[in-house]
Design a protein with these regions (language model features):
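Aromatic-enriched alpha-helical interface/lid elements that frame and gate functional surfaces
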Residues: 153-233
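Hydrophobic residues in well-ordered beta-strands that form the structural core
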Residues: 14-15, 40-42, 235
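Beta-rich nucleic-acid/ligand-interaction surfaces
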Residues: 123, 202, 241-243
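A structured beta-alpha segment of the ubiquitous adenosine-cofactor-binding alpha/beta core
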Residues: 1-33, 215
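Residue-level detector of anion-binding/catalytic polar loops
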Residues: 11-12, 37, 112, 232
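Conserved N-terminal glycine/acidic-rich loop preference
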Residues: 9-15, 50-54, 201
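Conserved PLP-binding catalytic core of the aspartate aminotransferase-like
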Residues: 208, 235-243
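Active-site-adjacent "lid/gating" segments in soluble enzymes
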Residues: 22-165, 169-170
Length: 243
């Protein structure tokens, strides 16, 4: 049955441990003998070759080795896993794009690709900023929670009700001025918040001011009010709220 499927298919995708397909008699040479035009995509934890190829891998391993968890967490806190194990879906999405590209390339060139997708590399594609920061400065970036390295405010703030939150972010002085006018009529002219550098320097105080304003308001009310004046804000949605 498998040979019949391979003979009439465009792509074979496997997510076995390294060497399993060959042990089953369906390594790339055997697959190509059945169908010379078959595209083969092999998904693994650490790639099909190299010193780590045979290591065990689950989703958290990809985030650890790629540096994602080292960049995740609050100031002064430990490295933290993300809310979902991004390595699993991330590897699948990376493979899907690679297969689509391979199909297009085969149409143009007649060459069938063999694709090697590792979970570590898939996760690493999401960690560009910390890597570049290290290359530029020689220092490991500090964990900053929900904050941004440059912009403030940039945080998830408490709203009224149980476990309700709303994200608010400003990346220009104009956006800040509009937000500040809503928070306090005198705040737009406050010297300690006038520029992006000022706001970042006084971020802790700024977060306290915004939290004091949001905590007594419905998270949707906050989002709609701020979106109406061109400030990026949206409630943090739980699975229950989404359903």
């Amino acid at each position: 049955i498998i040979e019949q499927l391979v003979g009439t298919s465009d792509v074979v995708i496997d997510n076995f441990g390294v060497g399993t397909m060959a042990d089953l008699g369906f390594g790339i040479e055997e697959l190509r003998a059945i169908n010379p035009d078959i595209i083969v995509a092999s998904l693994s934890g650490y790639g099909q070759t190299g010193p780590s190829a045979w290591y065990m891998a689950y989703g958290p391993a990809g985030g650890s080795l790629a540096g994602l968890y080292a960049a995740t967490g609050y100031e002064g806190g430990p490295a933290t896993e993300t809310g979902i194990s991004i390595g699993d879906p991330g590897t699948g999405m990376t493979a899907a794009w690679a297969v689509a590209a391979a199909l297009a390339a085969r149409t143009r060139t007649g060459i069938a690709a063999a694709i090697d997708v590792s979970m570590v590399e898939a996760v690493a594609s999401t960690v560009g900023e910390p890597w570049m920061a290290y290359l530029a400065t020689g220092d490991n970036p500090e964990r900053i929670g929900n904050h941004d390295p440059v912009w403030a405010p940039h945080e998830c703030y408490p709203a009224s009700g149980r476990d309700n939150w709303v994200t608010i972010a400003c990346t220009t002085d104009d956006e800040w001025q509009r937000l500040a006018a809503v928070l306090d009529p005198e705040l737009p002219n406050a010297p300690r918040f006038l520029t992006a550098v000022d706001r970042k320097r006084n971020e802790f105080e700024l977060d306290q001011i915004i939290s004091a304003w949001t905590c007594g308001r419905d998270h949707w009310e906050v989002a709609r009010q701020l979106q109406a004046i061109g400030v990026a804000a949206f409630p943090s949605q739980s699975p229950q709220a989404l359903w």
